[in-house]
């Protein structure tokens, strides 16, 4: 992704625009596997291969929730599974922080640990790749057909580890006044209604928070002419979320 801090398609003439090890882009990883709107019977589209590079650790960890819902043994969502399987995920170490970064308070490190195929790090104009899956190893083997790769020295590996440690310590200092995530449930239960009333006053039910958050997995399936089945992300903030046949709302 480029200077706009959005994922962008990499072309030969835009390779130099890639920003490495920067905080997360505005586009969540979720939208690649569960788009806001998609035709779920368009098999050709879902069979396209792609590489998603520069994914922060927080987004990779959030994928656990989506996988738990859409790859559950009881029923595996075929569209979501194809989107996942046809993607090579390259996670990125975070070397700088944004104002609201607080992954460590949730037990997440500022460098990839799960749900990715490779990790990318940039130190002193040298790109380091670490394989984390069989898919990642196969991709490295393909890359070696076109360019030379070298094993890092022990000092280079230590430099990467030192940078990770420094960023993690900076995050811990920055968020030292935040509560432990294990206490979040108790804090919510004891907060009362006033705080929810305060924030609901400015909510316009746009559903943007649900669209980007990996904990929100609801969708609505619409059937259109020509055997087109369109899945839309749904959200409990939408005024019509609870409506059923004939426009009835059982929660009112």
Segments predicted by a language model, with ranges:
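A sequence-composition feature that detects small, non-aromatic residues
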Residues: 26, 166, 208-211, 235, ...
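Ferredoxin-type iron-sulfur electron-transfer modules in oxidoreductases and energy-metabolism complexes
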Residues: 177-201, 219-252
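Local cysteine-cluster metal-coordination motifs and their immediate loop/turn environment
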Residues: 56-61, 104, 201-220, 231-241
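Iron-sulfur-associated redox domains of electron-transfer enzymes in respiratory
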Residues: 1-187, 191-196, 214
């Amino acid at each position: 992704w480029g200077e706009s801090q959005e994922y962008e398609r990499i072309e030969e003439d835009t390779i130099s625009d890639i920003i490495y090890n920067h905080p997360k882009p505005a586009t969540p990883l979720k939208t690649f596997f569960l788009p806001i709107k998609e035709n779920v019977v368009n098999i050709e589209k879902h069979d396209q291969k792609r590489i998603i590079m520069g994914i922060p650790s927080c987004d990779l960890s959030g994928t656990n929730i989506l996988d738990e819902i859409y790859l559950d043994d009881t029923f595996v969502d075929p569209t979501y599974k194809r989107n996942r399987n046809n993607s090579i995920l390259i996670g990125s170490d975070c070397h700088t922080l944004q104002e609201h970064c607080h992954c460590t308070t949730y037990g997440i490190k500022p460098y990839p640990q799960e749900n990715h195929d490779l990790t990318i790090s940039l130190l002193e104009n040298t790109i380091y790749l670490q394989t984390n899956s069989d898919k990642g190893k196969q991709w490295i083997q393909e890359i070696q057909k076109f360019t030379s790769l070298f094993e890092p020295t022990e000092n280079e590996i230590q430099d990467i580890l030192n940078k990770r440690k420094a960023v993690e310590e900076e995050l811990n200092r920055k968020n030292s006044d935040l509560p432990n995530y294990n206490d979040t449930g108790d804090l919510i239960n004891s907060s009362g209604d006033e705080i929810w009333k305060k924030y609901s006053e400015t909510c316009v039910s746009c559903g943007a928070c649900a669209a980007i958050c990996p904990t929100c997995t609801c969708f609505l399936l619409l059937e259109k002419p020509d055997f087109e089945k369109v899945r839309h992300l749904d959200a409990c903030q939408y005024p019509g979320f609870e409506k059923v046949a004939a426009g009835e709302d059982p929660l009112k």
